């Protein structure tokens, strides 16, 4: 039976995202037993790790940050595993398959945010915080308001990501494995809850590390086989691809994805600063022992991800040659079976046969599990640590805080499953773009200015943060993706697809204006505390260190 996957085009603008979704109507496929067996091996192995981790999780520090005992190299792999999703793998290779060189340019947008994290954020974040980025933002500002804002920003980003990820998981698994959509969503939700509930950050970290190794191995093998086919010559690779692609030499020309400079700038800023405001990524810097290891984490993560994106570029061009030119992978209408996002999966079959196809399918599923586990832990910590322990019940014991965290994991898991089922046939591609815009417009400005600007006050952070968050949401709703494609209006009120340029500007201006005009005694006290914060951020004096179990 031929595979039919329609309506994938709508997801391509965000397909390269680290947590994007595969959306559209999917026809259920014959059961892929090789893929299911390989995935079951992965599940059994990772559940064994979760059991091992559960024996070591004795405290709040163990649960949230694995006791701070993850090394820089391990954390770098885990960050890469958290950031590289199934849609990142399938989406970027699909963009290269359809658009050529533009696919590489688009993928770089997700990479350029990491030098910002390396040079501006990683060390100071580790020296100032313990469990969440709200620890840093509220270091010298009023705990209650800042933690509520930070938690809201985190939970909105996590919720949008989780919905996109769960729907993407259901669609992808239905396509690759032949499993029922609802079964797939429930399976992902249950496994996600088990990893986080029992193993905490330690189990989540190792699931992400294993997934990163498997994905990098699979992508490396595919790229190697493609290069072997062309005699390890990039000249031959590009020449053969241009010879068979419908666009010919145009696939080597940039500029086809984004139509105007404003959209290009807004997209770039959203990707760059959004990465530096993602709660599940920032949380990973508290799992290492000190600022030096945090810096090494970013160094290794950037290397792994840069290597991965180079591989997807080769895989995309390989798919043009070995898949696009092969009628075996086309339907009766001449379109790629399963849609363009299946280009890498078909290439896996072309270079490694059915067994390797099963392996890549299992890796795609494992990838989803690793990402949703990190998201769930970030959401749970925002509720239990930021809201419960520091706002609603100050002085709560570690045991009470952990209990609230685990209850939150269960609630988030159930909500994710329910929303995954409800959004089955909805266009959810915009959710990822909105999550990035909110992270860039609310979380990032507050984190950056709280660490670097001595005149920041609680009033400025609150007004600017809320303005950035609301502006991002409103402009996204009024833009072409939601206002026209989803709500059905003829013309968008806000003409640009990506709101980040405007919402980030509003956030920074709001923070500056309301801080500069804050003449209160509280504001003066917060400015005076900057020097002590600066010393702590540079030296790490007083920071909670990793400890041996």
Curated annotation (Swiss-Prot):
InterPro entries: Cation/Ac_symporter_ActP, Na/Glc_symporter_sf, Na/solute_symporter, Na/solute_symporter_CS, Sodium:Solute_Symporter. Keywords: Cell inner membrane, Cell membrane, Ion transport, Membrane, Sodium, Sodium transport, Symport, Transmembrane, Transmembrane helix, Transport. Gene3D superfamilies: Sodium/glucose cotransporter (1.20.1730.10). GO terms for biological process: plasma membrane acetate transport; sodium ion transport. It is found in: Cell inner membrane. Its main location: membrane. The chain crosses the membrane at residues 33-53, 77-97, 103-123, 148-168, 183-203, 206-226, 262-282, 303-323, 355-375, 404-424, 428-448, 464-484, 493-513. The keyword Metal-binding does not apply. One of its GO terms (molecular function) is acetate transmembrane transporter activity. GO terms for cellular component: plasma membrane. It is a multi-pass membrane protein. CDD domains: SLC5sbd_u4. Transports acetate. Belongs to the sodium:solute symporter (SSF) (TC 2.A.21) family. NCBIfam families: PRK09395.1 (NF006903), PRK12488.1 (NF009135), sss (TIGR00813), symport_actP (TIGR02711). This is Cation/acetate symporter ActP. The lineage of its organism: Bacteria, Pseudomonadati, Pseudomonadota, Gammaproteobacteria, Enterobacterales. The gene is actP.
